[in-house]
């Protein structure tokens, strides 16, 4: 089980990312567009730099939805490898079977 403070911090980061997502997308589009004047591009870069660090989506960590484990995460299920195995063996994941070859 991950520390509750780490899980809470990650949740706050997700909220911050959601709050700034549209403006960040607009600014990055202005910066990437080749037809943008240099002064406008610099202003967009400065505004992007002034935003909080936690507004970047890369700062959010994928965590297990059951216990918050940060490593061994499977996106398709939202679970870590440990909980994925336990729930698959218990039959809680429809369509998941143990492989044999």
From Swiss-Prot:
GO terms for cellular component: small ribosomal subunit. Keywords: Ribonucleoprotein, Ribosomal protein, RNA-binding, rRNA-binding. It comes from the Bacteria. The keyword Secreted does not apply. One of its GO terms (molecular function) is structural constituent of ribosome. Binds 16S rRNA, required for the assembly of 30S particles and may also be responsible for determining the conformation of the 16S rRNA at the A site. GO terms for biological process: translation. InterPro entries: Ribosomal_uS14 (IPR001209), Ribosomal_uS14_bac/plastid (IPR023036). Residues 1-20, 28-72 are annotated as: Disordered. Residues 38-53, 61-70 have a biased composition (Basic and acidic residues). HAMAP family: Ribosomal_uS14_1 (MF_00537). Belongs to the universal ribosomal protein uS14 family. Coiled coil: none annotated. This is Small ribosomal subunit protein uS14A. Gene3D superfamilies: 1.10.287.1480. Part of the 30S ribosomal subunit. Contacts proteins S3 and S10.
């Amino acid at each position: 089980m991950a520390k509750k403070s780490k899980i809470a911090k990650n949740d706050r980061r997700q909220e911050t990312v959601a709050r700034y997502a549209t403006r960040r997308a607009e600014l990055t589009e202005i910066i990437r567009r080749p037809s943008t004047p240099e002064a406008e591009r610099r202003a967009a870069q400065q505004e992007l730099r002034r935003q909080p660090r936690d507004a970047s989506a890369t700062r959010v960590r994928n965590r297990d939805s059951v216990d918050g484990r940060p490593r061994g995460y499977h996106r398709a299920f939202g679970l870590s490898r440990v909980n994925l195995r336990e729930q698959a063996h218990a039959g809680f994941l429809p369509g998941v079977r143990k492989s044999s070859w």
